[in-house]
Amino acid sequence: MDHFTPDLLNEIREQFAFVDKCPFAGERIFFENAGGALTLKSVVETSSKFAAIPDNQGRSNAASKALMDVIQKAKSDAASLFGTTKGQFFVGESGTELLFRLVRNAASSADMGGNMVGSSFEHPATRSAAKYWAAETKRKYINVQHDDTLGHVTADHYSNTITPDTRVVTILHASPVTGISVDLKKISEAVRSISPEALIIVDGVQYCLLYTSDAADE
């Protein structure tokens, strides 16, 4: 805890709901990296506020217009958070569910044939999805084996696996188990140098919690 004074740590902890007490099991410390996440109290308040509003966005009334303004502001804030000025933002039930949809859409829309590439470093959110949709689209799934010593994969690992007819590539930006990250920019450049039209899907769920994101640069 050398990075935090006791006062700062308490201030941070105070921002989250149920940090040290479960509403069902009583006192405990939430220390789970794959079965949920702590929620900011401000998020709980905001979610409750908007859940109570009966109007849908896209209608011709004051409430609907206000909701549309909130959505546009949220998208602008998200662009700043992720370091980009282009692209689209959309939401879903979970990161795993969204990644499955992205892999499905990429595999379905890519040119026929070729292969799909992922690594043993990845979370099942992309790894299992890529294997499934490779089989569904009659493509070979090729695994990039991670380095046990480094605990991750490198651009060279991908370069040795990617082929000119690689259609879809999945990359894990940071491990949800160890927090170890990869050089996404170098890996993406390695992929593009061999298969310029390959669709790259990045699982950045854990990375965004630990590091500053710069989507435009990576």
Regions found by a protein language model. Name each.
Residues M1-S213:
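Pyridoxal 5′-phosphate
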Residues D214-E218:
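A short, hydrophobic C-terminal helix/tail in secreted or cell-surface proteins
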